[in-house]
């Protein structure tokens, strides 16, 4: 199939009117067409399918439930929203529950109509009790290398990101041991600039939901935010649901980190795509009202927004469209070392493609 006349996104952040060839047999982007099928994309943007590396659940289901059918329904919902690849993200739970959840990724079809599972984001239990957010305090503990090896094996070595608080005992050794096999993300942490700087020097390369569940950027104590901005290999997630982060801070984060290091995420929980009401997250009740999801004490408990809407929010907040697409596609793919496969329109990559109208509504999902 040949997609003609569309404004095709390029990794520079620009759009160019050109043809894009898809091998419909292999579902890969190709150099030459195998058939004469043509899709006229006149007036449409052509972008890669989005990649969400931090998403807990949707449509009443959560990855941590350990329910294969529920995870498959999450994958279907995400695909319908233009999110064609994702890292199901766990909560802080006992090892046996995490083991059961991680095993479910093998049961989700890698087929049309389902978002592709690119790996797992393990958020906890190696987090700070002081910055636990919606994580359950009784399950938190220091990094445990043996436990992580067991969980990695249970997942089929599919853990792509692990969030840790670098101030916890044993964090530096943990980072050094696993930095070559998984992205080490700093988050849910009270770490000072110096502690975070040492963690990045040891091999950490990612920040979990920048600004949330960490000390604010202070002019005398810049903390994780300042250390990450100073570290050229650190990439930073940011929740762009319009609730977690003020639009001005979104704009300034892109200025601080640059267009190549920002990653848009949803941090969506099970109430996403559902009616208002009471739901559950990590063993705790959560109230959803509109786009806001909170614990009963008012603590924000993940988002109720999908990544496509977060990308549209970013554009509304003043981020150029080409830059917002980059932050929702190739940057997250790069962070989990999958940028040749997903989040790109390069020849040989999966043909996960979105066609958008000028108002950024989805016209077609390939």
Predicted feature residues:
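Alpha-helical scaffold segments that flank or form the walls of functional sites
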Residues: 45, 53, 63-116, 139-154, ...
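Divalent metal-dependent hydrolysis catalytic cores, especially in the metallo-beta-lactamase
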Residues: 56, 72-101, 115-128, 155-167, ...
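N-terminal metal-binding scaffold of metallo-dependent hydrolase/deaminase domains
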Residues: 1-34, 364-365
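Conserved, mostly hydrophobic/aromatic
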Residues: 43, 122, 178, 207, ...
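His/Asp/Glu-enriched, well-ordered alpha-helical/loop segment
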Residues: 227-236, 242, 254-266, 271-356
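Active-site gating loops and adjacent loop-to-helix segments of metal-dependent hydrolytic enzymes
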Residues: 76-87, 128-156, 198-210, 221, ...
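Active-site core of metal-dependent hydrolases
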Residues: 153-274
């Amino acid at each position: 199939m040949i997609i003609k006349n569309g404004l095709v996104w390029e990794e520079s952040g620009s759009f160019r009117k050109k043809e894009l060839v898809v091998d419909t047999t292999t579902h890969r982007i190709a150099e030459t067409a195998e058939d004469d099928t043509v899709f006229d994309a006149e007036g449409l943007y052509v972008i890669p399918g989005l990649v969400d590396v931090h998403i807990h659940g949707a449509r009443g289901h959560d990855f941590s439930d350990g329910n294969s059918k529920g995870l498959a329904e999450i994958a279907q919902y995400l695909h319908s929203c233009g999110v064609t690849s994702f890292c199901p993200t766990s909560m802080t739970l006992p090892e046996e529950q995490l083991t059961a959840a991680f095993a479910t990724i093998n049961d989700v079809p890698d087929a049309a109509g389902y978002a592709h599972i690119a790996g797992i984001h393990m958020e906890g239990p190696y987090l700070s009790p002081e910055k636990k957010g919606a994580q359950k305090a009784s399950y938190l503990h220091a990094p445990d290398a043996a436990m992580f090896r067991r969980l990695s094996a249970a997942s089929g070595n599919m853990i792509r990101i692990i969030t840790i608080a670098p101030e916890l005992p044993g964090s530096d050794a943990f980072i050094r041991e696993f930095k070559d096999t998984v992205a080490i993300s700093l988050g849910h942490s009270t770490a000072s600039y110096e502690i975070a700087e040492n963690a990045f020097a040891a091999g950490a390369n990612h920040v979990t939901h920048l600004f949330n569940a960490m000390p604010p950027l202070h002019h005398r104590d810049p903390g994780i935010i300042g250390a990450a901005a100073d570290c050229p290999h650190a990439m930073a997630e940011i929740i762009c649901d319009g609730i977690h982060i003020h639009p001005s801070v979104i704009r300034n984060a892109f200025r601080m980190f640059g267009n190549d290091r920002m990653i848009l995420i949803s941090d969506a929980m099970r109430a996403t795509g559902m009616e208002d009401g009471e739901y559950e997250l990590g063993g705790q009740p959560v109230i959803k009202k509109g786009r806001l999801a909170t614990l009963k004490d008012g603590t924000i408990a993940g988002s109720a927004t999908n990544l496509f809407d977060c990308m549209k929010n970013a554009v509304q907040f003043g981020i150029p469209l080409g830059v917002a697409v980059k932050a929702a596609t190739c940057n997250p793919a790069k962070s989990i070392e999958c940028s040749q496969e997903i989040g790109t329109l390069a020849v040989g990559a999966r043909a996960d493609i979105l066609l958008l109208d000028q108002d950024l509504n989805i016209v077609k999902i390939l």
